[in-house]
A protein has these predicted regions:
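Structured recognition/catalytic domains enriched at protein termini
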Residues: 15-158
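Serine/threonine-rich low-complexity intrinsically disordered regions
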Residues: 1-2, 61
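Cleavable N-terminal signal peptides of Sec/SRP-targeted secreted and luminal proteins
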Residues: 2-16
Length: 158
């Protein structure tokens, strides 16, 4: 029985992947057209264990709408406790994230894309920010959350 429990725990860690398509996530997106891609299985908060890449981020205009697109790379929906995807932002590399949007997991299949518009917040400081997406599984047989981040530069409105 212990062997079965350990095997199920191992399997749970391989389910429920998420990748951020737009803006491009930190690191690579190797193999994302196949369910279960390693680049979509990052469980270390707040950014999947990937370091900032501030000189590679895209520029966003404060106060404008921007479409964030994520991929549910591998489904882990549980009808009795459905999860969600959150889109969050913080200035720079430190501090608290502020939730900008939430998408409910309705049991769409692996490789499904989700897009939502956010209003880019006005920067308080130097304009560099971290955009974070989190897949909150709410499934006790899986990791609680999967993380991706993108580095962005927020430009003030003229």
């Amino acid at each position: 029985m212990k062997t079965v429990a350990v095997f199920l725990l191992f399997l749970a860690g391989t389910w429920a992947h998420m990748c951020m398509i737009s803006p491009p996530q930190r690191g690579s997106m190797m193999g994302i057209n196949k369910a279960g891609a390693d680049d979509c299985a990052l469980v270390t908060g707040p950014c999947g264990g990937r370091m900032a890449m501030p000189h590679t981020g895209i520029a966003l205009m404060a106060g404008e709408n921007f479409t964030v697109t994520i991929q549910k790379n591998l489904d882990h929906y549980m009808a009795s406790s459905p999860g969600m995807f959150t889109i969050n932002m913080r200035e720079g590399e430190q501090g608290e994230f502020k939730q900008l949007a939430m998408i409910k997991d309705m049991g769409e299949p692996s490789l499904s894309l989700y897009s939502t518009n956010i209003t880019v917040p006005h920067p308080m400081g130097h304009g560099m920010a971290t955009l974070q997406t989190v897949y909150v599984t709410k499934n006790p047989q899986a990791p609680a959350m999967f993380y991706e981040c993108a580095d962005v530069h927020i430009m003030p409105r003229p």
